[in-house]
Amino acid sequence: MFGRTYYCGEITEKAIGETVKLKGWVQKRRDLGGLIFIDLRDRSGIVQVVFNPDVSKEALAAAEAIRNEYVLDIEGTVSAREEGTVNPNLKTGKIEIKAEAVTVLSTAKTPPFPISDQAADVSEDVRLKHRYLDLRRPAMFQTLQMRHQVTKSIRHFLDENGFLDIETPILTKSSPEGARDYLVPSRVHEGEFYALPQSPQIFKQLLMVSGFERYYQVARCFRDEDLRADRQPEFTQIDIEMSFMSQEDIMALAEEMMAKVMLETKGVEVPLPLPRMTYEEAMNSYGSDKPDTRFGMLLTDVSDIVKDTEFKVFSSAVANGGVVKAINVKGAAGDYSRKDIDALGVFAGNYGAKGLAWVKVEADGVKGPIAKFFDEEKQAKLAEALEASEGDLLLFGADKFEVVAQSLGALRLKLGKERGLIDESLFNFLWVVDWPLLEHDEEEGRFYAAHHPFTMPVREDLDLIETAPEDMKAQAYDLVLNGYELGGGSIRIFEKDVQEKMFGLLGFTKEEAEEEFGYLLEAFEYGAPPHGGIALGLDRLVMLLAGRTNLRDTIAFPKTASASCLLTEAPGEVSDAQLEELHLSVKRKVKQ
């Protein structure tokens, strides 16, 4: 009886009178004394099965012992439900199956939690410990089904556009740039280690040098970094690289691909071309390099208005090269007490802010701790700059630009969510362009690559390498959706001398650069084409399209926030024999 004629959730009234064979799990069992009803579930949905002695006494007797999550093989006839028993909440709610035969394929213990999307109070640890049960829930199946549909759509688009799906190594060489590597000891080469790839970056560039011209890969990547809700130690990215393409060409292709994905998976038409915003504009107006444009409450620079005020926090910040910015929380003056605003200040402090100044706009002017520092003229200018009116709450940050932008940007997002300003039905894509090539770490006194060391500077800025590297712009572009970075790309360096200069800016000696990246530098000596690409985070994209709140829900078997697998209990200890084979010994920390 291993053949099946229908999936449970796909039987309609058209099948009334047919004899069908079904397979699935028992979602629910109800004994009404003489009749037994079972909701049979498979990946497509649920159908009601009725065990009636008038149809089959043998089937009814077998159903007496059946419990939730048993796996059944059922044969029966499709019938219309009686009037008054139709279930409008089920796709199969107008029909039922009159069971003629049933075979128990597998029994089941009582699950540790209900197999239902309504089981919201179950802890995530319990769900992850029993992930194979958690994945039976319809919402989890639908999320992974969407992941499949997204990947399928992307593969089809890239195939139609002449891209080749090429795999790159998982065991590769550790790189000094980026996050920490996951290291794999070599048994054959004593004391030496492979690294799991943080991305296929160099290999895809080498494929361009090899002449493949258009490459893609659904690539597994690994980073040993501190985790948060939208990160995992192992993740998947849609990796794309092209030769002889400009930044405009790559962005046009990537956004066309995303429009196709949105139409095929969500039925949403995305107008093209996508909007663009410079990095400087994003940081100035949104306090973020991945702005959420679904709502307003933009950051406004009021430095010129308040620079000569007697409020020293403002005047000193401007005098010392910093800024004063503000956000207008429309209509919020009556909703936030002093205690509430103090709590907002504590939140801003998590992002480096030393405090949060504020005033409330009332009919006769502004009120609040710093209101006395604003005369009528300044109040009028602030009201104009912030489009403020009676009932508004104005929040100010004063410090270095980076601190103010980051703290007010985070506060903007928090308040946008709290006040219901974000339309969750929107999918707002945009490109962030004109990135700085380098970031300067003041504590270490050195430069870091804003994206990665292989990003090509804007051609006009190449002369600044020796004189003003901090002013160089990158040929880089990030794709943002609803305040999340979906991915980033750039035109790559393909000339050996430029790449060597870039390594020098990042603190590599010529010998260190040769030792770490000599094979890439040598490849550039054999005729390298101009090339560039983009990498998009598949897990994050699916999270946003499926309306989930963390990446773990988009991955079949994810890791926890501490990078462990509760199902398999990885990572785990290994035997002394295994360590000896690898020429390793474990040095354990002494517990205090």
UniProtKB/Swiss-Prot annotation:
Protein origin, superkingdom: Bacteria
PANTHER family noted in UniProt: ASPARTATE--TRNA LIGASE, MITOCHONDRIAL, ASPARTYL/LYSYL-TRNA SYNTHETASE
Organism annotation: Bacillus velezensis (strain DSM 23117 / BGSC 10A6 / LMG 26770 / FZB42)
Catalytic activity: tRNA(Asx) + L-aspartate + ATP = L-aspartyl-tRNA(Asx) + AMP + diphosphate
EC number from the UniProt entry: 6.1.1.23
Amino-acid positions noted as binding L-aspartate in the UniProt annotation, renumbered to this chain: 177, 223, 451, 492
Gene3D superfamilies, sorted: Bira Bifunctional Protein, Domain 2 (3.30.930.10), GAD-like domain (3.30.1360.30), Nucleic acid-binding proteins (2.40.50.140)
NCBIfam families recorded: aspS_bact, PRK00476.1
Ranges where the record places region Aspartate: 201-204
Family from the record: Belongs to the class-II aminoacyl-tRNA synthetase family. Type 1 subfamily.
Name this protein carries in UniProt: Aspartate--tRNA(Asp/Asn) ligase
Localization per record: Cytoplasm
Single GO cellular component term: cytoplasm
GO molecular function: aspartate-tRNA ligase activity; aspartate-tRNA(Asn) ligase activity; ATP binding; catalytic activity, acting on a protein; nucleic acid binding; transferase activity
Keyword Nucleotide-binding: yes
Amino-acid positions noted as binding ATP in the UniProt annotation, renumbered to this chain: 223-225, 232, 485, 537-540
Marked site positions, Important for tRNA non-discrimination: 84
Keyword DNA repair included in the entry's annotation: no
The protein's assembly and partners: Homodimer.
GO biological process, one term: aspartyl-tRNA aminoacylation
Alphabetic keyword roster: Aminoacyl-tRNA synthetase, ATP-binding, Cytoplasm, Ligase, Nucleotide-binding, Protein biosynthesis
Known role: Aspartyl-tRNA synthetase with relaxed tRNA specificity since it is able to aspartylate not only its cognate tRNA(Asp) but also tRNA(Asn). Reaction proceeds in two steps: L-aspartate is first activated by ATP to form Asp-AMP and then transferred to the acceptor end of tRNA(Asp/Asn).
